[in-house]
Amino acid sequence: MAQEQPKNNEKSAEKTQTKPVIELLIPLEKYLAAGVHIGTHICTKFMEPFVYRVRNDGLYILDVRKIDERIRIAAKFLSRYEPSKIAAVSVRTYGQKPVVKFCNYVGCKPFTGRFMPGTFTNPSLKWYFEPDIVLLTDPRADSQALKEAAEIGIPIVSLADTDNRTEYIDLIIPANNKGRKSLALIYWLLARQILRERGLLPPDGDLPEPPSEFEVKFKR
């Protein structure tokens, strides 16, 4: 009796392996509504790995899953540091309230508005601060803080849009770092995730305020 041959459609020897899908920190729709994925019409070589696609009008779109992944990584990294030794910086107007709210929750030091030269490098200044790590909103706008952090050799975490160069940055968080809603959501998520990493919030815990409370409001 002839031995039965394996059927052609059998895949016993070659099983398809799929990577487990990690649930996003918030629903995809909330990321999209805040515009965190909206890039610019320019993309540097540094930011190419984080691009999802290019629209017909030439606008680069960031990959939301990579944004989410980097928020998790950055939160885990930042949570290892003494909060009072973390400097969070934003020269950009739309990033200033988010940075202050972030620091209120996390316990780190905010630097908003014009960054005074020598803040990290000149101990003789009355506003001198010696951080162990720096979180920047925009490598271009926050270039003075970036330069000084690199000079003293401390780790640098930074949000970066598609048009940013990222020399000296140790950990990039790809994101729209120009929009009000985007910056509010990113800093809200970072604060929440850091508190979760520290055990100050349960794994599914939320901040007592919504992301909209991190957003810059215009007076009418």
Curated annotation (Swiss-Prot):
SUPFAM superfamilies: Ribosomal protein S2. PROSITE patterns: RIBOSOMAL_S2_1, RIBOSOMAL_S2_2. Pfam families: Ribosomal_S2. It comes from the Archaea. GO terms for cellular component: small ribosomal subunit. The keyword Ribosomal protein applies. The keyword Heme does not apply. Residues 201-220 are annotated as: Disordered. Keywords: Ribonucleoprotein, Ribosomal protein. Signal peptide: none annotated. One of its GO terms (molecular function) is structural constituent of ribosome. NCBIfam families: uS2_euk_arch. This is Small ribosomal subunit protein uS2. It comes from Staphylothermus marinus (strain ATCC 43588 / DSM 3639 / JCM 9404 / F1).
